Amino acid sequence: MKSTRRISVIAVMTAACVATNYALIGFTNVKFMDLIVFVSGLAFGATVGSSIGALTWLVYGTLNPYGFSLPILFATSLGETIYGMAGGSLRKLGLLNNTGFAKSQILTDGVKFAAIGFLLTFIYDLLTNMASAYSLGLPLVPVLIAGIPFALLHEVSNACFFFLGVTPLLSLIKKLPESDLRQEMKSI
């Protein structure tokens, strides 16, 4: 992908993440951002997906009504790149070639993506809760225990979003006029 196109994709997808974060700001830990970052990594590679994740948190984490904390901003920015890297890694492993858009494969792919979304979110929540404990000077175990309800909500909602959203988003990206995926996904 050409550098101008890469920058455009990063800008547009980052804007989509930030916009959906603000749209869902009243719903704690329920966001489309992780799904968008993962699909961006899957569709455009780990570098693009990770850049979208980090930039989203740099914008959203700085201009956030919940306040600003540098250690937590660092952890969320770093943590969000995990989704982009995972999507890019699965792309390199050929997952795009195995992702079907036929009705018979949607359920199977949805379950796989839900499991991936749940696992990535568990890692993200662990990292960010550890950063919260550190930045607040609190013992780690009580912070992790107190975070369980929020983490479960985040993990389950992401599993649902990944189950329902990965294949349709990839399908939409495939339809873009100059999408690199058009060539890669012709056989799908």
Map each language-model feature to its residues.
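Short, flexible micro-motifs
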Residues: F44, V48, I52, T56, ...
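Interfacial aromatic-anchored transmembrane helix boundaries in multi-pass membrane proteins
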Residues: V18-M33, L55-R91, L95-L96
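Hydrophobic alpha-helical transmembrane segments
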Residues: I7-V12, L35, V39, S50-A54, ...
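Hydrophobic transmembrane alpha-helices
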Residues: M1-A43, T47-S51
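Membrane-embedded alpha-helical hairpins and interfacial helices in multi-pass inner-membrane proteins
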Residues: G26, Y66-F74, S89-I188
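Hydrophobic transmembrane alpha-helices of multi-pass small-molecule transporters
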Residues: L35-F38, W57, G61, E80, ...
